[in-house]
């Protein structure tokens, strides 16, 4: 009986007023989320200007001039070697009497070559040589356009006469020369536009080159003035005090 009472005493019922013991739970303070740094606004893309556009197309414009010059030279050589120019009127072959396919072609090739070289090696003498060559090339192209238009007007009058003639070698040659003049007129206008665009770019480049030294001078003054003042301060601080 004593053992039974002792075991019942050990099995005491829990007191409902006492709170049940629970393991201590450590509460970690949650750190506040880090504030996101404000993102810098993206820099706007650089504005596309005529200068930046032409700078990308310099070599293309130079190659265009070289090709136009070579085509004009080929046409002039083929026509003069296959046709007896003395058998035709001067008005029909005004283009070749003036020698435009030859001197015009040489000027186009020269200006195109200098434009390509000045784009690859941006030296002062090449840039200014390219500018001068393109000015001469644009003048030559303008004269060539005038000669070609005059040649077309003369050929059109001769072609009206050839409408009533079915078989005539002179009319056939005149028709061929007219088509050739039209093709050369298109190529000459293309060379003229290329030369004018290159002149515009080179003149703008010369203006920028003349402005750069003044800007650099002001930048150097702004950059080096605090450096000089800092050096003066350090010299004064490190100077020994003479008693």
From Swiss-Prot:
Keywords: Disulfide bond, IgE-binding protein, Membrane, Phosphoprotein, Receptor, Transmembrane, Transmembrane helix. It is a multi-pass membrane protein. GO terms for biological process: cell surface receptor signaling pathway; immune response; positive regulation of mast cell degranulation; regulation of release of sequestered calcium ion into cytosol; signal transduction. GO terms for cellular component: endosome; external side of plasma membrane; Fc-epsilon receptor I complex; plasma membrane. It comes from the Eukaryota. Residues 1-59, 118-130, 200-243 are cytoplasmic. InterPro entries: CD20-like, MS4A. The modification Phosphotyrosine is found at residues 218, 224, 228. The keyword Endoplasmic reticulum does not apply. The chain crosses the membrane at residues 60-79, 98-117, 131-150, 180-199. Coiled coil: none annotated. Pfam families: CD20. It is found in: Membrane. Residues 1-48 are annotated as: Disordered. One of its GO terms (molecular function) is protein kinase binding. The keyword Acetylation does not apply. The modification Phosphoserine is found at residue 225. Belongs to the MS4A family. Tetramer of an alpha chain, a beta chain, and two disulfide linked gamma chains. Binds LILRB1. Interacts with FES/FPS and LYN. Interacts with FGR. High affinity receptor that binds to the Fc region of immunoglobulins epsilon. Aggregation of FCER1 by multivalent antigens is required for the full mast cell response, including the release of preformed mediators (such as histamine) by degranulation and de novo production of lipid mediators and cytokines. Also mediates the secretion of important lymphokines. Binding of allergen to receptor-bound IgE leads to cell activation and the release of mediators responsible for the manifestations of allergy. This is High affinity immunoglobulin epsilon receptor subunit beta. The lineage of its organism: Eukaryota, Metazoa, Chordata, Craniata, Vertebrata.
């Amino acid at each position: 009986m004593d053992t039974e009472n002792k075991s019942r005493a050990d099995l005491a019922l829990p007191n409902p007023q006492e709170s049940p013991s629970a393991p201590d739970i450590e509460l970690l303070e949650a750190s506040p989320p880090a504030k996101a740094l404000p993102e810098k606004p993206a820099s706007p893309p650089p504005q596309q200007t005529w200068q930046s556009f032409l700078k990308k197309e310099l070599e293309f414009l130079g190659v265009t001039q070289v090709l136009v010059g070579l085509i004009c030279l080929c046409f002039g050589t083929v026509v003069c070697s296959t046709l007896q120019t003395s058998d035709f009127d001067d008005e029909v072959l005004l283009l070749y009497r003036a020698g435009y396919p030859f001197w015009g072609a040489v000027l186009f090739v020269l200006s195109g070559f200098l434009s390509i070289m000045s784009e690859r090696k941006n030296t002062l003498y090449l840039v200014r040589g390219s500018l001068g060559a393109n000015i001469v090339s644009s003048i030559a192209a303008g004269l060539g356009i005038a000669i070609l238009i005059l040649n077309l007007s003369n050929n059109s009058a001769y072609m009206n006469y050839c409408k009533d003639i079915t078989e005539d070698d002179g009319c056939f040659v005149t028709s061929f020369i007219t088509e050739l003049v039209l093709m050369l007129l298109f190529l000459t206008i293309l060379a003229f536009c290329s030369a004018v665009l290159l002149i515009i770019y080179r003149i703008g480049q010369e203006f920028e080159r003349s402005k750069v030294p003044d800007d650099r001078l002001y930048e150097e003054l702004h950059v080096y003035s605090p450096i000089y003042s800092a050096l003066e301060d350090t010299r004064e601080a490190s100077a020994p005090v003479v008693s």
